[in-house]
């Protein structure tokens, strides 16, 4: 279902993309994926409205967002902000499931994966980060991954010229 707001958002993104290309600006996605040695793991904000904005901002147009273990998203508000809910996969993994394997599948299927999974070990976190880096994916985690996660809000505010 395409709402008027969503259609306007897509039109605006298309116009901005053409304007950026006309003046020689590179898309944020092109620059971030071109950087080497940076972690693909962002520490997401606790405030849900900021988290939704971050997910929308780091997801490429026509990209997919995967969510696992994150509660109280506020899907209606997310849709109003421009998140295409037809391109969102949600996994609610129980404690009996192989959570690391499920997160790995989300990384294979989605451009941006948002995780709030306390069951992941440090080794699983490193494996998921390496897989995300090799596939050009971004992980937004709501729990710090020592040595891997970086502040997502601060990264998003960087200007690319």
Locations of the language-model features?
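Solvent-exposed alpha-helices and their adjacent loops that cap or buttress functional pockets
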Residues: 33-35, 106-107, 133
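Fold-independent oxyanion-binding glycine-rich loops
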Residues: 45-46, 70, 117, 143
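Short, solvent-exposed polar/charged micro-motifs at secondary-structure junctions
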Residues: 51, 100-101, 151
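Hydrophobic/aromatic ligand-binding patch that stacks against planar heteroaromatic rings
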Residues: 57, 105, 131
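Structural alpha-beta junctions
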Residues: 60-64, 85-86, 132-139
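Long, charge-dense
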Residues: 64-128
């Amino acid at each position: 279902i395409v709402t008027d707001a969503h259609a306007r958002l897509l039109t605006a993104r298309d116009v901005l993309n053409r304007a950026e290309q006309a003046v020689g600006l590179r898309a944020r996605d092109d620059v971030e994926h071109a950087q080497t040695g940076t972690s693909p793991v962002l520490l997401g904000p606790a405030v849900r409205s900021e988290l939704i904005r971050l997910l929308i901002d780091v997801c490429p147009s026509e990209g997919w967002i995967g969510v696992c273990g994150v509660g109280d998203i506020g899907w209606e508000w997310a849709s109003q902000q421009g998140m295409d809910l037809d391109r969102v996969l949600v996994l609610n993994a129980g404690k009996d499931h192989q959570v690391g394997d499920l997160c790995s599948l989300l990384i294979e299927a989605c451009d941006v994966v948002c995780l709030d999974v306390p069951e992941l070990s440090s080794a699983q976190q490193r494996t998921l980060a390496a897989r995300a880096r090799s596939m050009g994916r971004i992980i937004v985690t709501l729990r710090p991954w020592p040595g891997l996660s970086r502040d997502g809000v601060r990264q998003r505010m960087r200007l690319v010229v």
